[in-house]
Amino acid sequence: MDRFFQIMRPRPGAKILDVGGLPALNGVPGLWNDHTTTYKITLLNLPGSFDRFSASELAHYELIEADACNCQLSQSSYDLVFSNALIEHVGNFQRQKLLANFILSASNNHWVQTPSPLFPLEAHCDVPFWWFLTLSQRKRMISEWYHGENPFTARQMASTRPIWASRLRQLFPDSQLTVEYFLGFPKSQIVYRRRNDVG
């Protein structure tokens, strides 16, 4: 998050929409846990996504339950739209485009981050060079996970689409593209736009 704050510099009180955000994930506090008193955070996620959280976990957030690919808000409703590791899960290019259009319409400023398919370990299943395996190899592994001990991973990988840099440029043509590296490998890709003061 350090890079996000350095580049986007949201002001105290900024209205931030986290598309795909949750208050916690697998027991780990969410990205905004230390910032809920500084910013007005709204989490948008699919219906039912917040049901497993307690009232105290949700207390500092505004919540929207909707499919971001089919959601309408007032134009530029937020000072900033943030999305981390969501766009690769929404489906085909048409749905990716719907999500991108929603993000672009909800604010003049955005930060969209997604794992790089070039990183040696796939971010969701930890299989080396997953996106360079043949389709039949990937299908076989997903089938084994379904019928084994990893049905969640199977469902996740069945719906994940790699987002290459060229696709990000198509989806966000007026945004800056930057890459985060780890041990010399591209680990994540970020498209961002900061048109005016955030907040």
Label the model's feature ranges.
Residues 174-185:
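Conserved S-adenosyl-L-methionine
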Residues 17-71:
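Class I SAM-dependent methyltransferase SAM/SAH-binding core
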Residues 1-14, 25-31:
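Conserved alpha-helix/loop element of class I SAM-dependent methyltransferases that forms part
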Residues 82:
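A conserved beta-strand element that flanks and buttresses the S-adenosyl-L-methionine
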Residues 102, 109-139:
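Conserved class I S-adenosyl-L-methionine
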Residues 90-106, 114:
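A short, conserved alpha-helix within the catalytic core of class I
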Residues 154-176:
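Short alpha-helix
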Residues 85-89:
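Short catalytic micro-motifs in class I SAM-dependent methyltransferases
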